[in-house]
């Protein structure tokens, strides 16, 4: 299937890799189908691209590559709605806000994208935890005193 991407232009995608967001994304409830596209120049970052709207795309990254101690629990409703049966089937990404210069860019740890990769079901999961920011630095977090 051919789609248009504001970041990558015209691109062929595998329809089996289309992610279903049954509730859409916050602010984009009508957009329910997205695909993760690789950024060839930098495998650490990806594009979460709407299948139907070329202008709706987010740069995402694996938050664990930057914040190794990042952790949270999913509620039962989310586990059921995403049909999660095994932790191994789950992928977590954080949406980035790109800034100039790039090292000032941030990631949203407060509302990660949670994906059941086996079922291709996903949602943006808003955490009710004060310890995570929606504008966390992409710079490695400072070590705690004594580390």
Curated annotation (Swiss-Prot):
Family: Belongs to the FliW family.
InterPro entries: Flagellar_assembly_factor_FliW (IPR003775), Flagellar_assmbl_FliW_dom_sf (IPR024046)
Compartment list: Cytoplasm
Chain's role: Acts as an anti-CsrA protein, binds CsrA and prevents it from repressing translation of its target genes, one of which is flagellin. Binds to flagellin and participates in the assembly of the flagellum.
HAMAP family: FliW
The name this protein goes by in its record: Flagellar assembly factor FliW
Top-level division of the source organism's lineage: Bacteria
Quaternary structure note: Interacts with translational regulator CsrA and flagellin(s).
Keywords of the record: Bacterial flagellum biogenesis, Chaperone, Cytoplasm, Translation regulation
GO cellular component terms, semicolon-separated: cytoplasm
Annotated GO biological process: bacterial-type flagellum assembly; regulation of translation
NCBIfam families referenced in this protein's UniProt entry, alphabetically: PRK13285.1-1
């Amino acid at each position: 299937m051919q789609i248009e991407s504001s970041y990558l232009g015209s691109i062929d995608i595998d329809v089996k890799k289309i992610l279903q967001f049954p509730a859409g994304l916050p602010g984009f409830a009508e957009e329910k189908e997205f695909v993760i596209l690789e950024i060839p120049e930098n495998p650490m970052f990806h594009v979460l691209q709407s299948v139907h709207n070329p202008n709706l795309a987010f740069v995402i990254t694996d938050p664990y590559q930057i914040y190794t101690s990042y952790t949270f629990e999913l509620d039962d409703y989310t586990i059921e709605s995403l049909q999660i049966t095994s932790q191994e089937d789950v992928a977590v990404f954080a949406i980035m806000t790109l800034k100039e210069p790039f090292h000032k860019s941030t990631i949203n740890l407060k509302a990660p994208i949670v994906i059941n990769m086996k079922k291709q079901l996903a949602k943006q999961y808003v955490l009710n935890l004060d310890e995570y920011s929606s504008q966390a630095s992409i710079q490695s977090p400072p070590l705690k005193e004594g580390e």
